Design a protein with these regions (language model features):
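Glycan-recognition and catalytic cores of secretory/periplasmic carbohydrate-active enzymes
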Residues: 1-392
Length: 392
């Protein structure tokens, strides 16, 4: 492989696809110029199917638009889009108890709350990234304040409803891993000891509790001290989620001058998760596996969703940067070839989100409450910059 040519071509591809395809689609069809914020329930051609707004995506697109401004080009429309999402969040997305909503109507009228703090995490990274883009430090402080609020909610018994009753005490991979990225993104705008302290706690928990060498797997749910829970949910492996965790840890390793222990931990998770996730028969990263080989109960267990492919593309490139091992470039090529052959719509902009196991399209919409402008554009921005860093 001609590494220089390979990385140069991909760098240009990511930028072009983002600037000419992904971002214009969401700016034209998603951005709500009347109420502020962003719609995500868009059909294949961009037609609005549902005016319900995902609070996750007010933060996620607020982040992406500012992240693009900081890393792709200083487009004032992108900066304004980020501000629109943040303004909408501040005006409409917080309940009186400080806990954010999950869904709101187009004008911000509350619809639904959930027992998580992911809305808060996405809002915080939008504010921190906007602070970097705009130079307005008040948004960095808002992000840090919101992070402190997240920690309060997580650490105050009874504030958030637990997933299970006390008969089965457990801890989840999702919040543990997402705090690594949330804290790191905020730290880029405002440094505070609480951020690196939480990253250290999360990484310790991932290493000591969630990584299970006996299965060569990082599990989604374990006991309070990492105990293996031998039921369907305790045996669950979500390969795409684990691979996302791997690159979060690689990003932290880079921040710490390529900390060897973190690189080894992250590449171990990536290697394990690739082995569980890659579909040898049809290609692509599969949704769910059982660490003991039993059938998974989730009805989408053998489907190919957009986001695990995106996270694998990032992680493989990051692992190559960290190690120089060309096996990760081969991994990047394998997942990229499959992803780009199956997910981009050849007739309309943007990508499909949901494929059957064999790579055929399950449904053609470009967005809903869970799919919107986040994983795909983040992959393109991050990988464009990674390629350029590696090329020097």
């Amino acid at each position: 492989m001609d590494v220089k040519q390979y990385l140069t071509e991909w760098s240009e591809c990511y930028r072009k696809d983002f600037v000419e395809n992904i971002m214009p689609f969401w700016m034209e069809h998603g951005l709500d110029r009347k109420h502020g914020g962003v719609y995500t329930c868009l059909d294949r051609d961009g037609k609005l199917m549902d005016t319900t707004k995902s609070v996750w995506f007010q933060g996620r697109f607020g982040f992406i638009a500012a992240y693009a401004y900081n890393n792709i080009e200083k487009n004032p429309e992108w900066l304004a889009a980020s501000k629109s999402c943040i303004d909408f969040i501040e005006a409409h997305c917080f309940d009186t108890d400080g806990h954010m909503f999950f869904e709101v109507m187009e004008d911000g009228t509350p619809l639904r709350k959930r027992r998580y703090v992911f809305s808060e995490g996405f809002a915080a990274i939008a504010m921190s990234e906007y602070s970097i883009a705009s130079g307005d430090k008040t948004y960095a402080q808002k992000a840090l304040d919101l992070f402190n609020r997240i920690m309060y909610m997580l650490n105050t018994p009874g504030f958030l409803t637990p997933k299970y009753l006390d008969t089965m005490k457990s801890q989840g991979h999702s919040i543990t891993m997402i705090l690594v990225n949330t804290a790191a993104r905020i730290r880029a705008a405002i440094d505070d000891p609480i951020l690196t302290e939480q990253i250290d706690r999360s990484i310790k928990a991932l290493r000591e509790n969630f990584m299970h060498p006996e299965f060569k797997a990082l599990l989604e749910m374990v006991g309070p001290n990492g105990e293996f829970i031998d039921n369907i949910n305790g045996r669950l492996i979500n390969p795409g989620h684990c691979i996302e965790t791997a690159w979060f840890i690689l990003e932290e390793a880079k921040y710490r001058n390529w900390d060897k222990d973190l690189v080894e931990m992250a590449t171990t998770i990536l290697d394990w998760s690739w082995d569980w996730g890659w579909d040898e028969q049809y290609g692509g990263i599969i949704n769910f596996r059982d660490c003991k080989g039993f059938p998974q109960q989730d009805y989408s267990q053998d489907m190919k969703f957009w986001w695990p492919q995106c996270e694998t593309i990032i992680a493989a490139l990051y692992a190559y940067q960290a190690t120089g091992d060309e096996k990760y470039l081969e991994m990047h090529k394998k997942i990229s070839d499959w992803t780009y052959a199956h997910f981009p719509d050849k007739e309309y902009p943007e990508w499909y989100g949901y494929l059957h196991r064999d790579g055929t399209v399950a449904q053609p919409a470009k967005g809903n409450i869970f799919k919107g402008p986040f994983h795909i554009p983040r992959m393109m921005i991050r990988c464009h910059t990674l390629c350029n860093e590696i090329l020097g």
